[in-house]
C-alpha cells in the first residue's frame, strides 16, 4: 500500500491520534487476519497499551533503529517485534510519520474460541500466525491485516498501568474492557475504583 492510499484509509483519522487516544478508540474494533489460502480470522480488540515518544518504555525512546523502524512509520503501519526469543507482539503505528508512537494490541476476543487464545500479545500473535514477516506491512482491505469497526457496545472501560515494564511503570496507559474474558491481566483495584464494586 502506498502512503497516498494509506491517507485515504478510513482508519487514518483514528490512528492519526496520539497513541494514548488511539488505544482507547481501538477498543471494540476487530483486528482482521487474512491468509493466503483465503481464510479470515477476526478478533475483537479488548485490551491495549500506548507507547509514545518521551515515554522511557517506548522502543523508540532513544532513537530509530532497524528493529523499531516500523514504529516510526505513518499511522496504520504494522510494527511486530519478538520478545524472549519466541513470542511476537503486534503494534499499530499512530499519530504521525517519523514519530515513535504506537498501540500494542494486548488481547483479542475471538468468537467461538476459548478466551485463552487471545489473552496476551504472544498468544494472539501465535493464534493469528503473526510474526516478523508482517513487520512493516500496512492495514488495508488487500493486506494480511486490517481493522473493522466495533459493532456492539463496549461495556465498562478500565484504565490502569502497563504490564511487564521496568520503566514508565506508573503511566496509566493500559485500557481494557472489563466484561471480556480475554483480558490478559485484570487490575482488581482499578476495577473497584472505576466500577464501584468491592474487591
Curated annotation (Swiss-Prot):
One of its GO terms (biological process) is base-excision repair. InterPro entries: Formyl_transferase-like_C_sf (IPR011034), MPG (IPR003180), MPG_sf (IPR036995). One of its GO terms (molecular function) is alkylbase DNA N-glycosylase activity. It comes from the Bacteria. Keywords: DNA damage, DNA repair, Hydrolase. The lineage of its organism: Bacteria, Bacillati, Cyanobacteriota, Cyanophyceae, Synechococcales. Pfam families: Pur_DNA_glyco. Belongs to the DNA glycosylase MPG family. This is Putative 3-methyladenine DNA glycosylase. NCBIfam families: 3mg. Its EC number is 3.2.2.-.
Amino acid at each position: 500500500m502506498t502512503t497516498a492510499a494509506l491517507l485515504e484509509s478510513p482508519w487514518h483519522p483514528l490512528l492519526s491520534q496520539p497513541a494514548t487516544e488511539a488505544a482507547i478508540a481501538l477498543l471494540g474494533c476487530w483486528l482482521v487476519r487474512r491468509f493466503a489460502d483465503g481464510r479470515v480470522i477476526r478478533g475483537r480488540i479488548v485490551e491495549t497499551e500506548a507507547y509514545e515518544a518521551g515515554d522511557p518504555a517506548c522502543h523508540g525512546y532513544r532513537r530509530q533503529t532497524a528493529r523499531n523502524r516500523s514504529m516510526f512509520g505513518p499511522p496504520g503501519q504494522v510494527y511486530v517485534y519478538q520478545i524472549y526469543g519466541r513470542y511476537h507482539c503486534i503494534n499499530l503505528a499512530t499519530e504521525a510519520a517519523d514519530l515513535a508512537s504506537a498501540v500494542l494490541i494486548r488481547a483479542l476476543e475471538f468468537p467461538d474460541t476459548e478466551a485463552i487464545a487471545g489473552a496476551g500479545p504472544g498468544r494472539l500473535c501465535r493464534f493469528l500466525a503473526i510474526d516478523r514477516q508482517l513487520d512493516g506491512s500496512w492495514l488495508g482491505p488487500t493486506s494480511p491485516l486490517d481493522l473493522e469497526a466495533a459493532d456492539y457496545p463496549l461495556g465498562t472501560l478500565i484504565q490502569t498501568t502497563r504490564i511487564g515494564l521496568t520503566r514508565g511503570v506508573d503511566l496509566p496507559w493500559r485500557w481494557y474492557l472489563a466484561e471480556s474474558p480475554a483480558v490478559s491481566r485484570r487490575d482488581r483495584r482499578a476495577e473497584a475504583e472505576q466500577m464501584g464494586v468491592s474487591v
